[in-house]
Amino acid sequence: MNPIERVHERYIKDRRVRVLAARLAPLFPQSARVLDVGSGDGRIAEAVGRLRPDLAIAGLDVLVRGDARIPTSRFDGHHLPFDDDTFDAVLFVDVLHHTDDPVELLREAHRVGRRSVILKDHDAQGFLALPTLRWMDRVGNARFNVALPHNYLKWSQWASLFQQLGYTVDGVLRHLGIYPIPLRWVFDRSLHFVAVLRIPA
């Protein structure tokens, strides 16, 4: 681990888990069965579960880690190995920009989810957005052998995808406060969002 990665591990990672869990927890339906796609170490899902003990959260990832905090199954990165309408909600936290085709997984989430998709990802709009996001991704993920295709979209592109796939955007959270000041001025800005996508009945 290089010095920058050590700083990230010590000062950013725990805060990110706390902040995102607090932002995400209120967004799920009551007593929902949730699929966390790309769940990684499971710390965010675990923290959401502490805030929302009514939820039943299952993890899914292409790389199942030995330190995963929630029950996690392996998948091929393309097809979600569940029947239609298995889950009330599907969660993606900083996952889709690691895929070559985010449409594929959003379509699969629409299939296996009954009510909503909760998506945390990046908005590549803004001053030096792309190099900033690439650098953040390298620091946070490279040492875990996570794929880094840097497939970042602008909000207008996300909105077009959601419409194309039949989702309704029920809400969008921005300025999430993941980073402390002064890092927030560089790495937060409007680069992050959480979208609540409703799956039509």
At which residue positions do the language-model features occur?
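Core SAM-dependent methyltransferase catalytic element
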Residues: P180-A201
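A short glycine-rich, Lys/Arg-flanked "PGG" loop and its adjoining helix->strand segment in the class I
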Residues: V103-V117
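A conserved beta-strand element that flanks and buttresses the S-adenosyl-L-methionine
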Residues: L91
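Class I SAM-dependent methyltransferase SAM/SAH-binding core
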Residues: D41-H79
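Conserved class I S-adenosyl-L-methionine
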Residues: S31-G40
